[in-house]
């Protein structure tokens, strides 16, 4: 209740101004949001303390993550299902004191679906990972035994139907998305997050070479996954 909301907004160019619909939405709800995640933190702490008191913590893999983020008014968006970092980025904390040294890795591209093969491998079941699994076993990166980066982009799908909605991809440096309405592309978005972390400057118009590159990658993936949206994209 004592949070200085305006001080928080002062360093966030993506938060709309006070007095606007989404600006007020953020200011009215951010305290509740922080109260919620504080409660989550306290209860995760209870689990950790129980593991420690039973002598299980050192050799237990604990994963703290989430299925999605939330915009909370940023970019004039209230919820999720959008390509902005507030929606797409999630916490990913992996603890295994006996095997993983504490560190922060901001460059490892990992998605929720990668946990399946990665956890199997960490637990000694690498050979049991089905050949049909299309996501990445990142166990060596998690253990700090490999600095090899996974360069495969992660793809983004949000649709009202197959003819309307967004498709896109996210690399380690860029976010790319296209929108179609009734089968016609009507918006292209490209952000360089290394220079524009709050995604305020759409550089699609100034970077046709990158648009072509990402468009080609995206189209190939959509064809691979039998998504008819691929036919709306230029070759």
Language-model-derived ranges and their functions:
Residues 68-74, 101, 108, 113-116, ...:
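C-terminal cap/loop subdomain of S1 sulfatases and analogous C-terminal strand-loop tails that border
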Residues 1-109, 122-132, 178-185, 194, ...:
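Active-site-proximal cap/lid insertion segments
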Residues 34-37, 41-48, 52, 116-120, ...:
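Non-transmembrane alpha-helical segments in soluble domains
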